């Protein structure tokens, strides 16, 4: 598990919170965790399936995503966060 913040990602930061925790699980599921509430948000397909099946308590990540400034009807991309968690998972 690792904490990341807006300071590290600048304008690419996709979240409404200033910092979040990234959790890379042994089964390959990736979750973003809100440190204030400990709510989990799935970041990949494995995590999404676990949420949908009720295996884990989580919410859709859209809840904590900022609007895309170039397309306000859409949410910001989480690609930079997915890249960061991939590196985290590979190093553990």
Where are these regions (language model features)?
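Mature extracytoplasmic domains of secretory-pathway proteins
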Residues: 3, 8-57
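C-terminal partner/receptor-binding element of secreted or periplasmic proteins
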Residues: 55-92
């Amino acid at each position: 598990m690792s904490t990341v913040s807006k300071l590290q990602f600048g304008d690419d930061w996709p979240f409404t919170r200033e910092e979040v925790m990234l959790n890379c699980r042994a089964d390959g599921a990736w979750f973003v965790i809100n440190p204030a509430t400990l709510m989990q948000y799935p970041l990949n397909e494995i995590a999404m399936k676990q949420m949908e099946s009720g295996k884990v308590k989580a919410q859709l990540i859209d809840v904590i995503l900022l609007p895309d400034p170039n397309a306000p009807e859409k949410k910001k991309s989480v690609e930079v966060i997915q890249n960061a968690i991939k590196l985290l998972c590979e190093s553990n």
